[in-house]
Structures are given as C-alpha cells and as structure tokens.
C-alpha cells in the first residue's frame, strides 16, 4: 500500500531535507521517495503546518509494571508513548520488585517485543 504525505516540514539534523518542506511517499513500511512529488493515485495526507521528525526517546519513565500493574502496564505505557511520538522508552520500575536482576531485564525485553516501541530496561 502506498501513502503520500504532502507538505511535510522535516526536522532531522541527519537528513538532507532538514528544515525543508517536502512530499514523502511511503510504500508498506519504507520511505521510497522524497521531494516535490506529483499527485498520485493513492491515499494522501496533507501535513501543512505540521512537523515530521524522527522518533523521540524517553530515557527515564516510571511505569507501574512489574509490581503496580493496576496503575499502568508496559503495554499501556508503550501505547501512550507511541501516540506521543516516542519510539524508545527507558523503563524504570516504580514497583516492587524493581529491575535488579537478569530475570527483570528479560521480562521487560520480552514484553517489549509485542509493543510498537522499544522498551529499554533501566536497572536499579
């Protein structure tokens, strides 16, 4: 499936399109073309007035799991982070037990495999 993003203001210091307004064609999960693209026979989104950037990383996030899942789970925290533009979150457990051994680290990593972002365990 193709999707055309029109008028995307790019903020990415590593991109040759940094601080430029361009059109971006995505096919599947890959960016296939960037520039001043013609109208195409595919769905399009006009991003005029919006900014397109790389994903953000949160280095310290107190999630409830493990230990306080009634407050927040890794899945709900990851979903909230993804909706805010974050692609990686450093997970600090504010529950008991903390992340202080190999099993705790493996738990975070395995739960993270089913989320849309990278969950990175931060040990205590």
Regions found by a protein language model. Name each.
Residues 1-39:
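N-terminal metal-binding scaffold of metallo-dependent hydrolase/deaminase domains
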Residues 14, 65-67, 97-99:
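A generic structural signal for short coil/turn motifs at secondary-structure boundaries
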Residues 24-29, 64, 75-78, 108-110:
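Short, low-complexity, polar/charged sequence segments that are solvent-exposed and flexible
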Residues 26, 69-72, 76, 99-103:
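Conserved active-site and cofactor/substrate-binding residues in soluble primary-metabolism enzymes
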Residues 35, 48, 123:
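Residues at the C-termini of beta-strands that transition into short coil/loop
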Residues 78-124:
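Divalent-metal coordination cores built from histidine and acidic residues
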């Amino acid at each position: 499936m193709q999707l055309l993003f029109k008028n995307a203001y790019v903020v990415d210091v590593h991109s040759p399109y940094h601080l430029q307004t361009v059109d971006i064609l995505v096919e599947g999960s890959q960016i296939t073309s960037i520039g001043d693209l013609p109208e195409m026979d595919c769905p399009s989104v006009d991003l005029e007035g919006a900014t397109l950037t790389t994903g953000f990383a949160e280095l310290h996030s107190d999630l409830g799991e493990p230990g306080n899942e009634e407050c927040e789970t890794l899945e709900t925290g990851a979903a909230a982070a993804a909706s805010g533009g974050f692609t990686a979150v450093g997970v600090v457990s504010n529950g008991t037990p903390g992340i202080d051994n190999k099993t705790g680290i493996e738990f975070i990593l395995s739960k993270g495999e089913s989320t849309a972002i990278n969950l990175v365990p931060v040990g205590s």
